[in-house]
């Protein structure tokens, strides 16, 4: 039987349990607590206190998420979209992507090497296939175009 979240202590404990597993954004944590039946006024109070104590941080969440998704082979376009869907502010997302220190061209090249063994496309069909894959992964079209025309990557 799930725990009843009808007291501030229970809501805080559940929020801290979720944060112990991984970083969460405020919107995501609010959604999870509501799904568990916590009243909105208790959620807001608990999350405000966690922010004051430094236990809940949007910037840490953004940094963690960007780093994790980049290591998984996703590009800035895809990461930006996913964070937007999670209810984060556009300006904060852009700042996190600027501050992450990731060389997106290098990440694109590594992904392309891993998936296509560094073989430049020989015809339009193969070029479209590689381009679709890299675009789906969230890399900008201009970066993909440079790479597939032989002007990007290890230069």
Swiss-Prot record:
The keyword Cytoplasm applies. It comes from the Bacteria. It holds the Pfam family RecX_HTH3. GO terms for biological process: regulation of DNA repair. InterPro entries: RecX_HTH_1st, RecX_HTH_2nd, RecX_HTH_3rd, Regulatory_RecX, WH-like_DNA-bd_sf. Keywords: Cytoplasm. It is found in: Cytoplasm. The keyword DNA-binding does not apply. GO terms for cellular component: cytoplasm. HAMAP family: RecX. Belongs to the RecX family. Modulates RecA activity. This is Regulatory protein RecX. It comes from Pseudomonas syringae pv. syringae (strain B728a). The lineage of its organism: Bacteria, Pseudomonadati, Pseudomonadota, Gammaproteobacteria, Pseudomonadales.
